[in-house]
Amino acid sequence: MLSRRIIPCLDVRDGRVVKGVRFRDHVDMGDIAELAQRYRDQGADELVFYDIGASPEARSVDVAWIERIARLIDIPFCVAGGIDSVETARRVLFAGADKVSINSPALGRPELITELADEFGVQCVVVGVDSVREADGQWRVRRFSGDPDKTQAVPLRTLDWIVDAQRRGAGEIVLNCMDSDGVRRGYDVVQLQQARALCQVPLIASGGAGAMEHFAEAFDQADVDGALAASVFHSGAIAIPELKRYLRGQQIEVRDVY
């Protein structure tokens, strides 16, 4: 069994890290470089940076801060937001990112997944899936979730999209359960379990972490490869070294903190 990954997520707006609840009411959490270095020093396995305004504002991610981060940290990092072409992905990767994550652009043009996989390899291509449980009990996909006023429902079942994204070349899936985002009540284990049953590539849980037990539940009950979280790390509610010690005590394999 490979070590499970602990992944802080940094939502970026205007070069600053912000965090909201269910994608609303964002609060400034600090400088992007300072937080990135802090998480690297604490033992994060990788980082995800999400330019939350890029896709809703129909612009590309700013590579200036990507270059800055690449000079400062020596752990893998992934960049998401506004990556809608091979050329944009190339700029992001050449600026120093290890992976790109696509979400709304892939929903608008699914063949983008294959284009990126063919150009850079599946190991560089992450597909982010924002999922909401609707009144009929089905989980369906949302797009442009970085801006609640522009978020759109997509008539596509989450589980169907996860299967299709893999077929097209996704090397990793990040499933963000929007109903749980920012409220710290735990990951949506039931949804993650159903995704895991269909997911042949690494699956990352996102949305809902509020206690160390929540990470253990996602790893033990849904068999995810990594757990992504934001507010509990930014606020200091959970420190990564303590989290890793706790997980080891639960017989969950994680990498050492150096």
UniProtKB/Swiss-Prot annotation:
Subcellular localization? Cytoplasm
Gene Ontology CC terms: cytoplasm
Gene3D superfamilies to which the protein is assigned, alphabetical: Aldolase class I
Under Enzyme Commission nomenclature, its number is 4.3.2.10
- Which terms does the record give in the GO molecular function aspect? imidazoleglycerol-phosphate synthase activity; lyase activity
Q: Which InterPro entries match?
A: Aldolase_TIM, His_biosynth, HisF, IGPS_HisA/HisF, RibuloseP-bd_barrel
Tell me a GO biological process for this protein: L-histidine biosynthetic process
Going by the record, the broad EC class of this enzyme is lyase
Involved pathway(s): Amino-acid biosynthesis; L-histidine biosynthesis; L-histidine from 5-phospho-alpha-D-ribose 1-diphosphate: step 5/9
Q: Which reaction does it catalyse?
A: 5-[(5-phospho-1-deoxy-D-ribulos-1-ylimino)methylamino]-1-(5-phospho-beta-D-ribosyl)imidazole-4-carboxamide + L-glutamine = D-erythro-1-(imidazol-4-yl)glycerol 3-phosphate + 5-amino-1-(5-phospho-beta-D-ribosyl)imidazole-4-carboxamide + L-glutamate + H(+)
Quote the catalytic residue positions: D11, D130
UniProt keywords (A-Z) are: Amino-acid biosynthesis, Cytoplasm, Histidine biosynthesis, Lyase
User: Assembly state and interactors?
Assistant: Heterodimer of HisH and HisF.
Function summary: IGPS catalyzes the conversion of PRFAR and glutamine to IGP, AICAR and glutamate. The HisF subunit catalyzes the cyclization activity that produces IGP and AICAR from PRFAR using the ammonia provided by the HisH subunit.
HAMAP family in the record: HisF (MF_01013)
Report the sequence similarity comment from the record: Belongs to the HisA/HisF family.
Protein name, entry field: Imidazole glycerol phosphate synthase subunit HisF
Species, as recorded: Stenotrophomonas maltophilia (strain R551-3)
